[in-house]
Amino acid sequence: MARGNLSSAQMGLDLAPVAASVRFLCGVDEAGRGPLAGPVYAAAVVFDPAKPMLRGLADSKVLTASKREALYDKICERALGWHIAFATVEEIDTLNILHASMLAMQRAVQGLAEKGVTPDLVQVDGNRCPQVPFPVEAIVKGDSLVKAISAASILAKVARDRELLTLHEVYPQYGFDAHSGYPTPQHLAALAQFGATPHHRRSFAPVREAIARGLVAF
């Protein structure tokens, strides 16, 4: 496992003694960095060390939608604590998608702490860490290596997909139910035909180009 770029401000503590005494490990992951529309979601999960680990956990991207939905409910039941958060399209356009993703993860951990679950260590998928008031490290490919991160990836993915299904009910012509906002040929064609909705990310090139051509939907 590889640690990301950790500053003293992000850490506050040396991880070596912390890792040796971890009881409550918090896994964190995001969903939705690549889409052209919709918020970016993040989840934080702490499993109860007194309970058997849930089987079937894996990176959400390799699971079917039905499997993710089934695991979502089991994770929520089995976890000691969990929290889902997001950063809005406006925040994505203002901060950029990387910083908005960090903000969503920070909110997920904060929400978990506000529920009374205090992690000894936070492990985040990827190579960068959000600023949180706990020891934190980044784990490259953590969503396939660390069960708590796998669980977080599933919660974030399912929550975001549900949000895009809601958008589909309002804007069925874009096919959000099929691509969840990702830049598929179907989505790009709809963007070119119908224009950008208020839920599209203006800072992303295909959306920016559509707006420049006067293609805006309300």
From Swiss-Prot:
EC numbers on record: 3.1.26.4
Pfam families on file: RNase_HII (PF01351)
Sequence positions that bind a divalent metal cation: 29-30, 125
InterPro entries registered for this protein in UniProt: RNase_HII (IPR022898), RNase_HII/HIII (IPR001352), RNase_HII/HIII_dom (IPR024567), RNaseH-like_sf (IPR012337), RNaseH_sf (IPR036397)
An example Gene Ontology molecular-function term: manganese ion binding
Reactions catalysed: Endonucleolytic cleavage to 5'-phosphomonoester
Subcellular location: Cytoplasm
Keywords: Cytoplasm, Endonuclease, Hydrolase, Manganese, Metal-binding, Nuclease
Domain RNase H type-2: 23-216
SUPFAM superfamilies linked: Ribonuclease H-like
EC top class, as a word: hydrolase
Cofactor(s) this protein cannot do without: Mn(2+); Mg(2+)
Entry GO CC: cytoplasm; ribonuclease H2 complex
Cofactor note: Manganese or magnesium. Binds 1 divalent metal ion per monomer in the absence of substrate. May bind a second metal ion after substrate binding.
One GO BP annotation of this record: mismatch repair
NCBIfam families assigned to the protein according to its UniProt record, in alphabetical order: PRK00015.1-3, PRK00015.1-4
Function: Endonuclease that specifically degrades the RNA of RNA-DNA hybrids.
Family the UniProt entry places it in: Belongs to the RNase HII family.
Listed HAMAP family: RNase_HII_B
Name of protein: Ribonuclease HII
Organism annotation: Cupriavidus pinatubonensis (strain JMP 134 / LMG 1197) (Cupriavidus necator (strain JMP 134))
